[in-house]
Structure formats: structure tokens, C-alpha cells
Amino acid sequence: MADASIQIEVVYASVQRQVLKTVDVPTGSSVRQALALSGIDKEFPELDLSQCAVGIFGKVVTDPAARVLEAGERIEIYRLLVADPMEIRRLRAARAREKRGLPG
């Protein structure tokens, strides 16, 4: 007979801290259901779980309501980027050039 629940992990990293929670969810739970059961939104009130991008082991889940979880999977909640990564790289390179005394 199959277990009535499976164990999964939910992770989120805010600017201040990181949390990894191990959660038992009913077999057949979707990503969206597991996030609700995890209570992670209570620890991070700024999280809007209906709007956050999520993934499993680094792969984005396009439909969290339909994706059924398997035992041992890790749901990752992704934050929005605060700055454009290309612009950050340009600024970093410019600072490095200035430090070495090279023309920009």
C-alpha cells in the first residue's frame, strides 16, 4: 500500500536570510498546494506565492497548480531581480578598469 504522504523541501532566500523547510504533503499534491501547506508565506509576509516564479531543482515550473510532486523534490521560490544583470556586469567591469587605471 502506498504512503498517504510524501516528504518534500521548500526553500526561499530573502536578502536577510534563507529558509529550507521539510514538509510532509499528501501524495498527489501540486507545487501550489505544497507551498500553501508549507506555511512559508507566514515567515515571509512579503511573498505573494501566486505571483512568485518557482522551480524544482533549478528548473522552472510553468504551471505550479498542475505539476504533481514526487517524494524528495525541492521546491525553490525565486525572487524578482532588483537590477538588470547586464547593467550590473557593465558597472563591475568599469570599476575593475578604473581600479587598474585602464581607460574605459
Curated annotation (Swiss-Prot):
Signal peptide: none annotated. It comes from the Bacteria. Gene3D superfamilies: RnfH-like. Pfam families: Ub-RnfH. PANTHER family: UPF0125 PROTEIN RATB. Belongs to the UPF0125 (RnfH) family. This is Protein RnfH. It comes from Pseudomonas syringae pv. syringae (strain B728a). The gene is rnfH.
